[in-house]
């Protein structure tokens, strides 16, 4: 069973294992929220995962309040991915970023974990009264587009930024 959890001292070794796998693969670690600081220092890393409303307000629109969750496979006691939920959108996130950033660790891809993880993130968005939810992916990232579509994503448009085409989807979380 999968569930979204916050980082704690107890599950920190699971994070280190996941981040080391990602680093060894040489792939970009996604979502960006989990690569902002060095994960090898628990206290510094933990404090970098959440941006409060007050901190976001002080940034004069450059940053938004967010929450970071790790996806725990409780049957295997394994972090299989992570999601970052942005509580609002600034101009940059409106065009390229969206409310949810998500990533599945390399060894766990192709198993439907992304679809389940996004479903759990959407439930959290509903709890936070975020609706509709914007999700964005590269046009070339077919698995991510499928994950969004399986979770009710409706394609609004495609936009190009810095030579990359991004697909923008909206998902209603409220009845």
Predicted segments with their positions:
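Conserved GNAT acetyl-CoA-binding A-motif
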Residues: 125-136
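Conserved beta-strand-loop-alpha-helix junction that forms the acyl-donor binding cleft
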Residues: 135-143
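Conserved catalytic-core motifs of GNAT/GCN5-like acyltransferases
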Residues: 136-137, 152-168
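Glycine-/small-residue-rich active-site loops that bind phosphorylated ligands and cofactors
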Residues: 77, 92, 109-110, 140
């Amino acid at each position: 069973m999968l569930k979204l959890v916050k980082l704690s001292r107890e599950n920190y070794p699971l994070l280190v294992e996941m981040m080391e796998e990602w680093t060894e693969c040489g792939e970009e670690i996604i979502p960006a929220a989990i690569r902002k600081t060095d994960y090898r220092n628990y206290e510094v890393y933990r404090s970098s995962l959440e941006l409060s409303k007050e901190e976001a307000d002080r940034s004069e629109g450059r940053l938004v309040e967010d929450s970071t969750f790790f996806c725990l496979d409780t049957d295997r006691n394994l972090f299989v991915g992570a999601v970052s939920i942005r509580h609002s959108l600034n101009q940059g996130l409106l065009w390229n970023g969206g409310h949810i950033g998500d990533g599945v660790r390399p060894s766990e891809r192709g198993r439907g974990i992304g679809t389940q993880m996004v479903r759990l993130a959407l439930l959290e968005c509903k709890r936070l009264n975020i609706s509709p939810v914007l999700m964005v992916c590269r046009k070339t990232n077919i698995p991510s587009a499928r994950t969004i579509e399986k979770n009710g994503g409706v394609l609004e448009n495609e936009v190009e930024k810095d030579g990359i085409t991004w697909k923008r989807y909206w998902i209603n979380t409220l009845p």
